[in-house]
Amino acid sequence: IPSAQPKSDNPIHAKKVEGEISDDPNAPVWKDAQASYISLGCQLEAKPKSYFPTVRNLTVRAAHNSKEIALYIHWDDPSLDPTLKKFTAVEESPPPPLPDHFKGLEPDEPHEPVIPEYPDAIAVQFPVNLDTHKPYFLNGDADHPVNLWKWTTATNKAIEINAYGLEGWTAQEGSTVSVKSHFRFGRYSLILR
């Protein structure tokens, strides 16, 4: 375990590749692409606020060819959103074995997972205009709009949004953004393209 968190990387560098970009997170293209560490914080801008996030960082790798850019994003999350099980295979860590004297009675009915009020989600923000002014980090603003690629466990789909601040956004018509997601032993992995 590192004694300190890695330095957050800004900007993210995309590896140039020939041909199709694999959506397999174990493919060589992702092992060769530079990893960028991104620190995350609390969500204090809009209600309901989140003072104590369960996810504190994520890692991004990017690759591009002459047709598209793809992002491999992964993060550790101790609390799987059970909705994802409707859409893709999920591998959860088994509970640790307990000595007999710590075991309780088996429940009469199976335990139903609790569906969270807010599903797990991630959004990647791109500036619409490549001027020298960076857009506001949360959905840009009226003068500096952004394009968002957003994924959520509620649908396990990616959508594309044009945002002009916290209150102003519209779905991108003709969006071609796609996602392949995985959850394995406490780690979400996505390939957005």
Model-found features: residue ranges?
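Structural preference for beta-rich elements and adjacent junctions enriched in aromatics
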Residues: 1-193
